[in-house]
Structures are given as C-alpha cells and as structure tokens.
C-alpha cells in the first residue's frame, strides 16, 4: 500500500517465494499477489536476457537507483561478482564520470577488464590510494558495497569522500561496526536494505531496448538433469564461473 514491498506484513507478501514459501525451484509455483509481484517478459526479450531481472540485476538496479549517482561522479563498487557487475551496469545508466570496481579475485577483475575496458579495476590492498588518485574529489562520490566481507565494509567508508553516499546491499556473516569516532568528520550518508521487485518492468524495458545486457555473466549452461554438477561448479567457483543457466532436462 505504501510501496515498502519488502516490509509487507501479510504472510503471503514481501519476501515470499523461496523464503517464507518453499519451492523457489519447483516445476510449478503459485504467486500470491501476482498483480504486484509478477512481470510479463516482453516478446523481444529472450529467457537468457531476462534471467537475472528478478534477482541480481534487480539488486544492482536498486543499488544504483538509491545511490543518487550524478554525472561527474566517481562510483566505487566493492565486489566484482555477478551482483557487483550488475550494479556496475546499472550505474552506467546514470552516466558517472568514472566507475572503479574492487575485488581480491584476479580472474573476476580480468573478466571486467576484458568486457568493460572503460571501468577501472583494483584489488582491496591498494584500493584507498587508487580511489583517491582517480577521484577528482579526493574519494568516491558514491560507494556501493556488494562484497559482504569485513574488509569491504571498512573500505566502503574509508574510500568515500566527505559527504558521499555509501550504499550497502551486501549480506554479512557477522555484525559490522561503524567506528563513528574515526568517521566523524566525513558526514557520510548510509543507505542499506533488501531489494524489492518493483522495478522489474523497467529493467525488462531497458533490456528490450538494448540498454542492459547481462548475458555475458552466463558463463556455463547445464541441463536440469545435471544440476548437481552445476551447483558443485558454482559453489567451488571453478573454471571462471560467474553464473550458471539451467535448461530443460536432456533425454
């Protein structure tokens, strides 16, 4: 009723499918309140193009949307996995001056450099100095924390310029602490929370118009009858995997 879909008090609303309601990978699903939570894929959008619209791409779109990115900004994205790259692609829609993406995994940084040469890449151990050298305002104007580690949470506020926006979309295994005495003079704005599905129709429109393309993230494809091998590959991050698409079972 108020647009805060994630905080819906109805037991069948909000975080329902795959969360409170089991069966996120079932053959058939019944979608409660489908007029709000279900979006038709346009005819000109393939299944592979639409695959991430309801999850990691929606997260990236939401992160960029609430981060108040302006032309001329330097945007730092912490995490070069699928969600980080989706955040990067959606940040590009706002035409910032520069995007920097940070990750400890050389393979993921190489993935970004090979496909998005205008994006700067750096590892966490050199991030703070690198961001300052490549930001006209002495730090990132916007930081999107997507990695979810203790180090990335600390880097988020350390690499931000005074009065920057720090958007936290990551999930953490442990509680994080804001060292307010160390941050006192930076006057940072923190935004955080879980993404909803309210922008899915707009995301699909952008895909249909060629403004968003996440198909490069699909590095591996498995039939449904080999899904256990797909899970093993993804969990162990072998063979440069980013995302795995599952197709109908092969006979």
Tell me the role of every PLM-derived stretch:
Residues 1-38:
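Glycine-rich phosphate/adenylate-binding loop and adjacent beta-alpha elements
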Residues 154-158, 197-251:
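C-terminal hydrophobic helical "lid"/dimerization subdomain
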Residues 40-125:
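Mid-domain Rossmann-like dinucleotide-binding core that forms the NAD(H)/NADP(H) cofactor-binding site
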Residues 103, 170, 194:
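Conserved acidic E/D residue at the C-terminus of a beta-strand in Rossmann-like folds
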Residues 67-68, 92, 97-100, 109-189, ...:
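Glycine-rich cofactor phosphate-binding loops and adjacent beta1-alpha1 units
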Residues 5, 26, 38, 57-60, ...:
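A general structural signal for well-ordered alpha-helical segments in protein cores
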Residues 30, 40, 245-247:
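Short, well-ordered beta-strand micro-motif
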């Amino acid at each position: 009723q108020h647009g805060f879909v994630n905080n819906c008090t109805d037991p069948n609303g909000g975080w329902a499918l795959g969360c409170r309601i089991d069966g996120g990978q079932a053959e058939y699903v019944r979608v409660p309140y489908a007029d709000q939570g279900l979006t038709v894929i346009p005819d000109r959008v393939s299944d592979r193009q639409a695959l991430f619209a309801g999850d990691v791409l929606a997260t990236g779109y939401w992160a960029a949307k609430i981060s108040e990115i302006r032309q001329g900004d330097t945007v730092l994205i912490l995490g070069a996995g699928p969600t980080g790259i989706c955040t990067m692609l959606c940040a590009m829609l706002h035409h910032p001056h520069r995007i920097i993406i940070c990750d400890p995994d050389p393979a993921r940084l190489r993935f970004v450099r090979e496909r998005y040469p205008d994006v700067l890449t750096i590892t966490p151990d050199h991030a703070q100095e690198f961001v300052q050298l490549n930001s006209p305002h002495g730090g990132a104007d916007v930081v999107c924390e997507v990695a979810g580690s203790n180090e990335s949470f600390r880097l988020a506020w350390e690499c931000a310029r005074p009065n920057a926006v720090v958007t936290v979309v990551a999930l953490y295994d442990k509680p994080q602490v804001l060292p307010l005495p160390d941050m006192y003079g930076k006057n940072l704005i923190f935004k955080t929370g879980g993404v909803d599905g309210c922008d899915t129709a707009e995301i699909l429109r952008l895909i249909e118009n060629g403004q968003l393309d996440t198909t490069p993230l699909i590095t591996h494809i498995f039939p449904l009858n080999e899904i256990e091998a797909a899970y093993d590959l993804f969990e162990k991050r072998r063979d440069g995997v980013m995302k795995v698409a599952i197709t109908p079972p092969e006979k």
